């Protein structure tokens, strides 16, 4: 399979999850790439990207992605689409609200152009962190519901995230599954 992981912030647990998943997919023989925000950068991020890049046969691409929604998202989605179209993908896997939106909007555009790509989404919190009843939550949760029609599957890293998603967004048509992130042998102190 040809898989592209899309995420905004290459930091924290979300980034760790993407690195683990993309690395394991590559080791199992898949062609894998990562598309992430270019404005979030520190020494650790640079080191982790340099370590994973040799495994990424589809490359590591960095584009500017703002944290909050704005006009810059149009340019970023177009860049995501252009990059994804050049890769002849089987799967777009969006991580977090922004990566999930870019992956699913790109899936919609590629399908309209005859490319049968599938889009999977792992929320990792994102829009689920907004307090219900607020204007921000209403906007972001409505966007989640609208984007679900371009989603072939939802993957949650915990039962908690799956439950909160169902409570706040609802049980849409996309299949949902909990897949816990694993630990590597180096994560244990011996």
Question: Residues of each region from the PLM?
Answer:
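Nucleotide-sugar donor phosphate/pyrophosphate-binding loop at the beta->alpha transition
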Residues: 72-78, 117-120, 127-146, 150, ...
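A short, active-site helix/loop in glycosyltransferases that binds the activated sugar's phosphate group
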Residues: 149-178, 183-188
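N-terminal strand-loop element at the rim of the active site
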Residues: 5-72, 161-169, 176-178
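A short helix/loop element that forms part of the nucleotide-sugar donor recognition site in Leloir-type
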Residues: 47-51, 79, 189-190
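Glycine-rich phosphate-binding loop signature in dinucleotide/nucleotide-binding domains
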Residues: 83-90
